[in-house]
UniProtKB/Swiss-Prot annotation:
Its main location: nucleus. The APC/C is composed of at least 10 subunits. Can homodimerize. Interacts with APC2, APC10, FZR2 and FZR3. Interacts with PANS1. Interacts with SAMBA. Specifically expressed in dividing and elongating cells. It comes from the Eukaryota. Belongs to the APC3/CDC27 family. This is Cell division cycle protein 27 homolog B. Pathway: Protein modification; protein ubiquitination. The gene is CDC27B. Component of the anaphase promoting complex/cyclosome (APC/C), a cell cycle-regulated E3 ubiquitin-protein ligase complex that controls progression through mitosis and the G1 phase of the cell cycle. The APC/C complex controls several key steps in the cell cycle by mediating ubiquitination and subsequent degradation of target proteins such as cyclins. The APC/C complex is required for the female gametophyte development and is involved in several aspect of development by controlling cell division and cell elongation. Involved in the control of endoreduplication.
Length: 744
């Protein structure tokens, strides 16, 4: 009965019927109370977004898997201290972190959100050491600015580590099959009730999977030894389905409960037969469905944090290893070379209906076919034992793969991750042009995906190339219309381009897609902000913060709106909240610097602009305002150096050139200032402030005709009301010397 209930719960979790899983698991715990069964119930609660239920259920438990699930529920409830205590018990200072790479990853997140960046980086690195394919850990290192080069992380050491794990599984499977073959050859009786003992079963399991306490439902029940042997003994059929599965690498950060439990599920009485004649291998799901499910789970590129951390453990179906085609030199495979051409629209549109499952089947690892019509297990193991090491196979994601195929697959996966990882690292270091060049090295089928195109859009956004950023994000929407990754930045791009209609349409689409995602409300807030309805915009940004308090950009957008409304106190609080979430969020440092600059607290302003500059040393906007602060502090020579750097960083940005001219005017270097302004007129021909400053220079040089001409040109360009008043005042006092004009 117990094994049947466990099987029912696992099936419900696999098919996302969480209500049934919870109900049946409650029956399981009532009939067979044990901590292992509580873990399965807690997993069901977590899948159903009931972290509070899992929290109360597991509080006080001691098994490693229970501690991990309890820490996960605490993390989702923002009880970070309790989560840390569960993973690192105070009374057991040398205790191993449960669940290997996933446990270290969770602990790293806890350290990150409690402002212990060095400890967080150590945990993320440790998780990558255990599982080099845990991409989420490497991305967190990039966010922290502590990532090593991708070639080092996803290099030969990582390849050897992964191959070693798979080879261990291969040798274990061969040993288990040989053992079963020997038993079958020496048996002369019906041995269906004489399966090997639970002690032997435990020994075999410990070689087949890493020892994670609490993952196996092998506890005793008052029901007779012979009956329990059916539940605890992994038959050869079950061994092929799950006992030889890859080690629990936790690539999707899933609680490792459901998959190990399949040891019981697969070895239930339904699959237990006379050991001298094994039935053909049965599958819970046919091969095509397995591929579709694994493909869908793997391609989900933008889950929210809560759903990522509580990813469905019941659907722990290992994805098939996909090969990555080599780089093609034809530049047309990308979206228009270094720029995004109009051809990309057709390219992505054609791929829009392309099935990920078909892509994996057509272009994935072509190992031995997964043939359900194989002979019985005993004969299969006999033939395997007679083959060379190269012909020895194991089942990965429902596909039989040889050791040679595994080696090739690992190499191809790591080659792909090296390119993606290096692009990600460069992006978070704000070396955006280098990041774009790196992403261009990807095969076209990976470049034309939502995640990569969003990263490309972010890179163009940081380069203040809003037109190219808009193209990239638009193509990302076409490739993955369901993905919200980067859509908050996309809405800001449309805000800067003043694309009112596009922004409104995007906001409505995002709200209809997921109204519980912070990106949706950020887009809505930007839409209202563009319409100058700052109070409504602020309400939308606050809603985004409410949905995800760890979304730093939402806090920053709140700060921008508070600053626009001249509520500097709340603006500073919002920026500080953003920095608590992400200390490298340079936008928040920049926002604080702007507030202090407007309050004429120049030392504070210079400090915050410098902090932003240290994080993003390639931003011409940050350099411009840093130079402005230095000039206000009478450090004009330093300010000029910074302005020169800003001009070199972005020739299209008129702000540093204008500020440089202002500084030169203050230093009485009028001829140099005029040269800068004449050059600036070519980049910003309709900027009224440029002509107004030229008018002031000509007035100082007593060239009144030219001064009047430039003041008039400035007025013709319809400047803001405050500038109009200043220009008219300068025109009225045209013949008054500056010394008299500036006297009190």
């Amino acid at each position: 009965m117990e094994a049947m209930l466990v099987d029912c719960v696992n099936n419900s979790l696999r098919h996302f019927v969480y209500k049934n899983a919870i109900f049946m698991c409650e029956r399981l715990c009532a009939e067979f109370p044990s901590e292992v069964n509580l873990q399965l119930l807690a997993t069901s609660y977590l899948q159903n977004n009931q972290a509070y239920s899992a929290y109360h259920l597991l509080k006080g438990t001691q098994m490693a898997q229970s501690r991990y699930l309890f820490a996960l529920s605490c993390f989702q409830m923002d009880l970070l201290n309790e989560a840390e205590s569960a993973l690192c018990p105070v009374n057991e200072p040398g205790a191993e972190i449960p669940n290997g790479a996933a446990g270290h990853y969770l602990l790293g997140l806890i350290y990150k959100y409690t402002d212990r960046r060095k400890n967080a980086a150590q945990q993320f690195k440790q998780s990558l050491t255990i599982d080099p394919l845990l991409w989420a850990a490497y991305e967190e290192l990039c966010i922290l600015g502590a990532a090593e080069e991708a070639t080092a992380v996803f290099g030969e050491t990582a390849a050897l580590s992964i191959q070693k794990q798979y080879m261990q599984q291969l040798s274990t499977s061969l040993g288990l099959n040989t053992y079963n073959e020997e038993r079958n050859s020496t048996s002369t009786k019906n041995t269906s009730s004489e399966d090997y003992s639970p002690r032997q079963s435990k020994h075999t399991q410990s070689h087949g999977l890493k020892d994670i306490s609490g993952n196996f439902h092998s506890h005793g029940v008052n029901g007779g030894v012979s009956n329990m042997s059916f539940y605890n003994t992994p038959s050869p059929v079950a061994a092929q389905l799950s006992g030889i599965a890859p080690p629990p690498l936790f690539r999707n950060f899933q609680p490792a409960v459901a998959n190990p439990n399949s040891l019981i599920t697969d070895s239930s009485p339904k699959s237990t037969v006379n050991s001298t004649l094994q039935a053909p291998r049965r599958k819970f799901v046919d091969e095509g469905k397995l591929r579709k499910i694994s493909g869908r789970l793997f391609s989900d590129s933008g889950p929210r944090r809560s759903s990522r951390l509580s990813a469905d453990s019941g659907a722990n179906i290992n994805s098939s290893v996909a090969t990555v085609s080599g780089n093609v030199n034809n530049a047309s495979k990308y979206l228009g070379g270094s720029k995004l051409s109009s051809l990309a629209l057709r390219s992505v549109t054609l791929r829009k209906g392309h099935s990920w499952a078909n892509e994996n089947m057509d272009e994935g690892v072509r190992g031995e076919p997964f043939d359900d019509s194989r002979p019985n297990t005993a004969s299969t193991t006999g033939s395997m034992a007679s083959n060379d090491q190269e012909d020895e196979t194991m089942s990965i994601g429902g596909i039989a793969m040889s050791s040679q195929t595994i080696t090739i697959g690992v190499s191809e996966i790591l080659n792909l991750l090296r390119t993606l990882g290096e692009g990600c690292r460069l992006s978070y270091m704000y070396r955006c042009q280098e990041a774009l060049d790196t992403y261009m090295k990807l095969p076209h089928k990976h470049y034309n995906t939502g995640w990569v195109l969003s990263q490309v859009g972010k890179a163009y956004f940081e380069l203040i190339d809003y037109l190219e950023a808009e193209k990239a994000f638009r193509l990302a929407r076409l490739a993955s219309p369901y993905c919200l990754e980067g859509m908050d930045i996309y809405s800001t791009v449309l805000y800067h381009l003043k694309e009112d209609m596009k922004l409104s349409y995007l906001a409505q689409e995002l709200i209809s897609t997921d109204r519980l995602a912070p990106q949706s409300w950020c887009a809505m807030g930007n839409c209202y902000s563009l319409q100058k309805d700052h109070e409504t915009a602020l309400k939308n940004f606050l809603r985004a913060v409410q949905l995800n308090p760890r979304f730093a950009y939402a806090h920053t957008l709140c700060g921008h709106e508070y600053t626009t409304l001249e509520d500097f106190e709340n603006g500073m609080k919002s920026y500080q909240n953003a920095l608590r979430v992400d200390t490298r969020h340079y936008n928040a440092w920049y926002g604080l610097g702007m507030i202090y600059l407007r309050q004429e607290k120049l030392e504070f302003s210079e400090h915050h602009f410098r902090m932003a500059f240290l994080i993003n040393p390639s931003s011409s906007v940050i350099m411009s305002y840093l130079g402005t602060s230095l000039h206000a502090l009478k450090r004009s020579e330093e300010a000029l150096e910074i302005m020169e750097q800003a001009i070199v960083a972005d020739r299209k940005n008129p702000l540093p050139m204008y500020q440089k001219a202002n500084i030169l005017v203050c230093l009485e270097r009028l001829d140099e200032a005029l040269e800068v302004l004449e050059e600036l007129k070519e980049y910003a021909p309709s900027e009224s402030s440029v002509y107004a400053l030229m008018g002031r220079i000509y007035k100082r040089r007593n060239m009144h005709d030219k001064a009047m001409l430039h003041f008039g040109l400035a007025l013709d360009m319809k400047p803001p009301a405050t500038d109009v008043a200043a220009i008219k005042a300068a025109m009225e006092k045209l013949h008054v010397p500056d010394e008299i004009d500036e006297s009190p």
